Amino acid sequence: MEEFKGYFEFDRVRQQNFLYPLFFRESIYVLAYDHGLNKLNRNRSIFLENADYDKKYSLLIVKRLILRMYEQNHLIIPTKDLNHNPFFGQSNLFYYQKISVLFAVIVEIPFSLRLVSSFEGKQLQKSYNLKSIHSIFPFLEDKLLHFNYVLEVRIPYPIHLEILVQTLRYRVKDASSLHFFRFCLYEYCNYKNFDIQKKSILNPRFFFFLYNSHVCEYESLFFFLRKRSSHLRSTSSEVLFERILFYGKIQHLVKVFVNNFPSTLGFLKDPLIHYVRYHGKCILATKDRPLLMNKWKYYFVNLWQSYFFVWLQSQKVNINQLSKDTLEFLGYLSSLQLNPLVVRSQMLKNVFLIETVRIKFDTKIPISSIIGSLAKEKFCNVLGHPVSKSSWTDSSDSEIRERFVRICRNLSHYYSGSSKKKNLYRIKYILRLCCVKTLARKHKSTVRAFLKRLGSGLLEEFLTGEGKIISLIFPRSYYASKRLYRNRIWYLDLLYFNDLVNHE
């Protein structure tokens, strides 16, 4: 960011909050579509003259787009006439896709500048292990043992586009950019009526920015009320801008609670609440207070309806008791398992038995969901019986084995934290036999004859990678014991979901 600061005049943008002129600068387009900087967009760059043959950037397309934006006065076009606007006709979806990427990059500039300025002069502790997906499970294992009730909320999406514009208006005070942002959103909705593929106009970075802005606004309000009880608040919570009518709406929510719960308003100050957000859901955990969970359920419904004007159905807010119900959390079925124990105690000459209960944080594999995902990808049928992967028979034998080993290794690493490994062994069995059937089909042979000719070397490849990693972590004596296969292992290098793991 410092490298391009003088070239793009970010200081001037920061002082005046004028982002709209950046849409007319060719250098910003180069920055937006640079493969080294734009890591969120895994697709090919669309700033190519011919994406199939020539992979050089074309500034000619950028100049054409800038000229079109100069010629069109889109700020005065009514919403009802957007379908007749020649600026983004059906034949010009190419230009809209470029503008959606550019808009996400430009609007991120003030956030990046404010984030850098807030961390200046501060020494931040680097905790790379906390970036792992598995890092949350040791926290839950330590905290949820003392909590009984969990409130699970599915974060609703805003129905009307003006809600997204209003959310962004609290942070971007450039009227021209906001009008242009509104115009792009309505154009995208109008394109849904055309007979085109959704992937042709979908830009991940643009919609990630919209979703994160929506969630950031919700969490900033929630953390403002519950910052003392939130143990997982974001480190960038200091980067919050002022909001229009923010405190007025806070007072409105307080009045709602005072009128409905005049004598029990103190639950807002309860410190024994933990908050976790994942995959469009959030959970709140508390101890021995079902009434508190019911109040928070009522609170969430009023929060979304009063502040965000979004109708939140009560069915999307579930109260679960961990000792009886299971919680679907990041691909695991989590619950609290109560194991009764009888302890023999002796005091002087008297011997007596003490009955106690041991609480264990249990994590299981959702085997039915994973088999459904494997069946969808043609690795097995709906009953879990392996079948050959016919679409891979054109590849070489080494490439086929490498694909199956990679998938098996990813699933094995992710679900290594399961309390019971029986379902994990079943998944490995499906992938191994599917690999053998695929190779046998390619060579026009039977499974028995192919295994007899190849030997046991094929099946050993599925265990080599996992065995090397585990042997580096644990001593050889412990690695050779059976306890390793019964205990849970959390890997702190998992930064993203595998496609087959993310089966929601």
From Swiss-Prot:
Subcellular location as annotated: Plastid, Chloroplast
Name of the molecule in the record: Maturase K
GO BP, one annotated term: RNA splicing
Family: Belongs to the intron maturase 2 family. MatK subfamily.
Main subcellular location of this protein, as a coarse class: plastid
Single GO MF annotation: RNA binding
Gene name of the record: matK
Main function: Usually encoded in the trnK tRNA gene intron. Probably assists in splicing its own and other chloroplast group II introns.
Organism: Aethionema grandiflorum
InterPro entries: Domain_X, Maturase_MatK, Maturase_MatK_N
Organism lineage string: Eukaryota, Viridiplantae, Streptophyta, Embryophyta, Tracheophyta
Pfam families (alphabetical): Intron_maturas2, MatK_N
One GO term describing the cellular component: chloroplast
Keyword Chloroplast attributed: yes
Keyword field: Chloroplast, mRNA processing, Plastid, RNA-binding, tRNA processing
